[in-house]
Amino acid sequence: NLHVISGIQNFVVETNEGINLDANLIGFDKRSDLAILKVTNENELNLNSIVFAKKKSISIGDKVYAIGDPFGLGLTVTSGIVSANNRNTGNPYLELIQTDAAVNPGNSGGALINENGELVGITSKIFSTTGSFSGISFALPVDKLSDIASEIIKFGLAKKASLGNFSIRSIRILHNNQLKYCGEIVNYSSGPILDLFETHERLCILKVNEEPMSLERLRLVLENAFPGDAITLTLLDNMGELHSYKIKTDSI
């Protein structure tokens, strides 16, 4: 996890045999709290990579194991079940796995594996009103992890989501006898947003992911999303008719 290595300049990875390996930071992504390190002398030890579980293979009730170094005690494995999938803890596009496997300081960034030893997620955080483990922990699922990690390894960062090149003109309109704020889409020239105007001459955004439209709301949704994620726009056309579209984002 990115929060684990923040502020650190030199990195050392310790194997379960107690061997220390120097490592370099390849890149990171703040949205997912993910960082990628690469050990510099991996060939000397013939290290094996963990097998990723198939995407969408984890179900509620499945047995899972969290591996980490809680409180610096050393390699520790705790067990639990998948309590829920697609949890939103601030960013709905991360769709975190919720488990009841014990997670404490030192577990962050550790593997969450299934009974076959396959990686299903990376432990990232807990929910607690006391600061201590309360039976609710979260992990970034392998579905998102593999996509984000691949981009970090290739580009040094994970690309941002985009709806294309366009501007928003803030206006107020009267709809259903109510005065509402609306973001009119103007100066559109490319990207997924352009497809909307194949059947419409003028469009105003009333809602973004079912929440009232504002420039800040649209910015935050795009900031949290990843390329390929869908954003739901509720639109009003020039005839006064409402439309709802799920638009798959592009990358920038």
Which residues are covered by each model-predicted region?
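Serine-dependent protease modules
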Residues: 1-174, 216-219, 223-226, 238-239, ...
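Conserved PDZ fold ligand-binding element
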Residues: 1-2, 185, 193-217
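Short loop/turn microsegments at loop-to-beta-strand junctions
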Residues: 9, 107-110, 184-185, 192-194, ...
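A short glycine-leucine-enriched loop at secondary-structure breakpoints
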Residues: 54, 111, 176-179, 190-204, ...
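Generic structural signal for well-ordered beta-strand positions
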Residues: 120-121, 206, 243
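Edge beta-strands of extracellular beta-sandwich domains
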Residues: 244-248
